[in-house]
Amino acid sequence: ESKKLVILGDMNADCNYASLNELDALSIRKSNFTWVVPDDADTTFSSTRCAYDRIILDEQISSSYTGWWGIDREMSNSSVSDHFPVWFELLRPSSSLNQ
């Protein structure tokens, strides 16, 4: 069985930490990866508008990605983090439904 890869988390991949030009120069941006959270998203509840939190899917898992993703703005607790949780939806493989 082939491996599937999801990369997610706070990557500081925006604003002062990484410009769009720097991000676009990364090989992972030019390859067969899907960046779920767009560059113009705001994943923090600070006064900045930065997409620090990212979800990146490899080509194999991208085929199961429904296109639905979001930022859970209801879950904000600054004692834990200054970031909102990000989420995405995958289709369940039909072969796993018969088990």
Regions found by a protein language model. Give the residues of each.
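Metal-dependent phosphoester-hydrolase catalytic domains
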Residues: 1-6, 13-99
